Amino acid sequence: MKIVTTKDNLQILHEDNHLIVVNKRVGDIAQGDNSGDKPLPDIVKEYLKEKYNKPGDVFLGVVHRLDRPTTGIVVFAKTSKALTRMNDLFSSRETQKTYWAVVKNKPPKEEDTLVHYIKRNQQNNTSKAHLKEVPESKKASLHYKIINELDNYFALEIELHTGRHHQIRAQL
């Protein structure tokens, strides 16, 4: 695999006629917010517009997002048909998303499935995990496995069964 880095430090991991896959860096935002920072889709659109010398607006569909303090692979659709197909794959759970996280302090078990009820606080953009259902909470489930450790830090491989707001951060 050849990684292409643009003048804006956009790292392109894959591109074809239908999709463009990029590495989202820590601090990049996957969609616009009130911070005034330029969202990753706008940077990708500028790249496509320049590369293909396209006048006017460039279509770019956001297939999925990652939180600002997270790095990882983000997939964008270059056509509406590709976006529909990718959305169908994600909603029918035909895709597999693997996450890696570093946590301080060892989890109780080497490998486990966690089930909580997550309540989102819109005002401060946080989520809190509860052991029992609380009003306006949503059930959240994930499976983790410790894959490495150093001092009191542990690298986990995580598979989400649900996709809740800040789920990994809230549950672990």
Model features per residue range: what roles?
Residues 1-172:
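RNA pseudouridine synthases
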